[in-house]
Structures are given as structure tokens and as C-alpha cells.
Amino acid sequence: MENEKQDLSLLYTPLILEHSKNPKNNVVLDSADISGSAVNPFCGDEISIQIQTERDKISSVGIESTGCFLNIASSSIVSQAILGLTVTNINEFIKQYRLMIQRQSGNSNDIVILKNLEDDIRKSLDEISKVRDFPIRIKCTLLVTMALQNIKMN
């Protein structure tokens, strides 16, 4: 049991903890063009995401995320990563993000759709991808993609 706790501590990096304690885009966008939400009924994690667009590009993102630190951190990171994408590219982002999280290797460079991503956001994606070594926690980092899949026009 002690080894499991020690191993899990590998996820508690300063960068991930910062996203968890001070999530980016942690606002409700009342004038959002599209929004979505998702809940993990097993653990109680929740996320709601609002997106404003300008000329079909994501111009603002608002998130409300509650639950474990991984859910909050991944929501924060993804909310930064999707800024500037077109709405039609969301599904491709979801697919590539899930592959990065679920496979044994790979990093943010594998998310081709994010080729012009800022270094700090890329580093955050690489940090959150370490969850792949803890299969039971992968769902925590994928809940944000479920909310994105559930987006609807307002």
C-alpha cells in the first residue's frame, strides 16, 4: 500500500497541482455559443464547459470543474489547449488527446492538431499524460473530453 501511495505521488507534480489549485479559465461564460457537461457517477467528478466562438474559432473557454485534482487540472489544461481551434476540430482534438493519455508512450507532440501550441501548455499536457501509468485514474483526465463530446449550441 505504501508503494502505491508513493507511486501515485508522481502525479502530484508542481505543475499539475498548480492547475488543480488555480485552474485556468475557471469562469462561467454566460454568453457562450456552445456548452457541454459530463459527470462521473462513480466518483462524483463533474465538469461543465462553455465556449465562445468568433468566425468558427474558439475564442474563449469557461470551465466549472469539481472533484479530484486530476479532473480539475486536466480541465484547466484542455481549456487552454483548445483556444484557437475551430469548432469542427474539437472531435479530432478529443481523439488525439485520448490517444496520448491512454497509450504507453507519446506526448503532446503527437497531438498534431496542436502543432502551434505554446510551450507551457505543451508541458502541462505532457505532465497530465503521466496518468497513463495509473489506469484507475485515467477516467479522471478524460472527463473533460466527455464534456466536449456533449457540447450543444446555445
Where are these regions (language model features)?
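Short, thiol/selenol-centered motifs that function as redox-active sites or metal-ligating centers
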Residues: 66-72
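C-terminal binding/interaction regions
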Residues: 1-25, 87-154
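Alpha-helical support elements that line or immediately flank enzyme active sites
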Residues: 74-86
